[in-house]
Structure formats: structure tokens, C-alpha cells
Amino acid sequence: MESPAFFFSLFVWCLLLSITAYSLYVGFGPPSKQLRDPFEEHED
């Protein structure tokens, strides 16, 4: 368990998890009210 590959893979896994959590927060959390909807802006 002391190999550098284990710690590197753990770091990459935590990085991907945090990016995913932040994306979900921005997409569905309180900041989503500030996002624009291009389909709603373009009325035919």
C-alpha cells in the first residue's frame, strides 16, 4: 500500500469525484438559476 501508483490513483479518483460533484451542484443546485436556456431564448 506504500506504492506511488496507489496514491496517484487515489488522487485521480478524488479529483474526478470532486469535479462530478461540482458539476452536479452547478447544474442542479442554487447556481442553476443563473444558467441561460438557449432553447427558451430562441422562440420560433
Curated annotation (Swiss-Prot):
A single BP term in Gene Ontology: photosynthesis
Keyword Transmembrane: yes
InterPro entries on file: PSII_PsbN
Cell compartment(s), UniProt: Plastid, Chloroplast thylakoid membrane
Transmembrane segments: 6-26
Membrane association type: Single-pass membrane protein
Keywords: Chloroplast, Membrane, Plastid, Thylakoid, Transmembrane, Transmembrane helix
Protein name: Protein PsbN
Coiled coil: none
GO terms under cellular component: chloroplast thylakoid membrane
Family affiliation: Belongs to the PsbN family.
